[in-house]
């Protein structure tokens, strides 16, 4: 599966949100977290003799994040006419979701965008957290501060 990193309105280079997402995904290795396989680029604008973009030969620079393939997202499955999850399926998906979230939290990552379209499921019933575009890393100091403030 591919996720295109939009470069249309980027005056300052590679988007910081994409850098953050890539850094987070590169440190997470768990069966319930989507695997980032590689990053691929396509050519940008061709250059003229002086190294300037040639307006006649413009090709938009495209950068893609390549992920392992998953067959469905939870929202797509749930929206199918007549689709009803069984109690064992719900328990299985919840266990996988919570296991993946626990792994992220132990590794100091907050996903911050849990929703059905970001929960990917393959045909064998394996669930993976996806789309870490809003995710943030945190430190132990922040967690200790939050715990003290909540007392």
Swiss-Prot record:
It catalyses: L-seryl-[protein] + ATP = O-phospho-L-seryl-[protein] + ADP + H(+); L-threonyl-[protein] + ATP = O-phospho-L-threonyl-[protein] + ADP + H(+); [DNA-directed RNA polymerase] + ATP = phospho-[DNA-directed RNA polymerase] + ADP + H(+). GO terms for cellular component: cyclin-dependent protein kinase holoenzyme complex; nucleus. Disulfide bonds: none annotated. The active site is at residue 113. GO terms for biological process: positive regulation of transcription elongation by RNA polymerase II. Keywords: ATP-binding, Kinase, Nucleotide-binding, Serine/threonine-protein kinase, Transferase. This is Cell division control protein 2 homolog 2. It comes from the Eukaryota. ATP binds at residue 3. InterPro entries: CDK (IPR050108), Kinase-like_dom_sf (IPR011009), Prot_kinase_dom (IPR000719), Ser/Thr_kinase_AS (IPR008271). Residues 1-151 form the Protein kinase domain.
């Amino acid at each position: 599966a591919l996720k295109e990193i939009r470069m249309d309105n980027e005056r300052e280079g590679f988007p910081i949100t994409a850098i953050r997402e890539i850094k987070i995904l590169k440190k997470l290795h768990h069966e319930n977290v989507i695997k980032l396989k590689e990053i691929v680029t396509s050519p940008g604008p061709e250059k003229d003799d002086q190294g300037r973009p040639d307006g006649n030969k413009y090709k938009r620079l495209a950068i893609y994040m390549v992920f392992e393939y998953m067959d469905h997202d939870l929202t797509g499955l749930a929206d199918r006419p007549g689709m009803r999850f069984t109690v064992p399926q719900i328990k299985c998906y919840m266990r996988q979701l919570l296991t993946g979230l626990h792994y992220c939290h132990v590794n100091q990552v907050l996903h911050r965008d849990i929703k059905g379209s970001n929960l990917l499921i393959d045909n064998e019933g394996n669930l993976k957290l996806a789309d870490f575009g809003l995710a943030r890393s945190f430190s132990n100091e922040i967690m200790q501060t939050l715990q003290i403030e909540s007392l």
